[in-house]
């Protein structure tokens, strides 16, 4: 987008899958089309910077965050443990060509991406993220819950089209008794904990 003229045609020929047309209507054709303007994925760069700072602040409080590419097209990575933080997974994610737990899956995903590129196309994917060590009681009900806050930020990334917490939409095929996360007392610490994590560690907008 260093050459604005490369994007001048977009005022007359909006691209499918981009915000060119709705932005044209909303801003009466006065928006910046160079590089996608303020709808560009380039603007996620400052989010990465803010995220890097936040990760350090959270780690200082014993809270760990880990994410990986869970799926590209029809190729899936090994799942993260949704209850226990595994340092081996983090090291694998940081080491592989793509941030995946399984090196073989990362290789196949890379081939899938390159194949789409060679056909002048693209391919979709899923990112899985886990937060470990978050204290119980963080968040608020209704419109200020943890899900609300996370979703609001996640949808700031232009390509994001869906967010799930815990079992997500798979709950539609489950009974309530299956989806519940029963409580138990840890024999060693005496603390209350859950046996499963179907709710994604959030109930009523508050961390469990």
Locate each region found by the language model.
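Short helix/loop capping segments that flank catalytic or ligand/cofactor-binding pockets
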Residues: 4-7, 78, 138-140, 163
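Short secondary-structure transition/capping segments
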Residues: 15-22, 110-117, 171, 175-176
């Amino acid at each position: 987008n260093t050459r604005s003229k490369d994007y001048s045609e977009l005022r007359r020929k909006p691209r499918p899958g981009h915000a060119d047309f709705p932005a044209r209507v909303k801003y009466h054709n006065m928006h910046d089309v160079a590089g996608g303007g303020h709808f560009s994925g380039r603007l996620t760069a400052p989010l990465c910077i803010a995220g890097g700072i936040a990760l350090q602040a959270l780690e200082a409080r014993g809270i760990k965050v880990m994410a990986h590419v869970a799926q590209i097209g029809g190729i899936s990575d090994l799942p993260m443990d949704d209850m226990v933080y595994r340092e081996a997974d983090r090291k694998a994610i940081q080491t592989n060509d793509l941030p995946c737990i399984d090196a073989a899956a990362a290789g196949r995903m890379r081939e899938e991406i390159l194949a789409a590129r060679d056909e002048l196309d693209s391919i979709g994917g899923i990112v899985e993220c886990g937060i470990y060590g978050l204290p119980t009681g963080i968040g608020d009900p209704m419109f200020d819950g943890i899900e609300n806050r996370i979703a609001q930020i996640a949808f700031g990334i232009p390509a994001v089209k869906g967010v799930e917490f815990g079992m997500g939409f798979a709950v539609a095929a489950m009974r309530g008794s299956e989806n519940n996360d029963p409580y138990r007392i840890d024999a060693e610490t005496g603390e209350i904990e859950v046996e499963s994590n179907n709710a994604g560690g959030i109930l009523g907008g508050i961390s469990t």
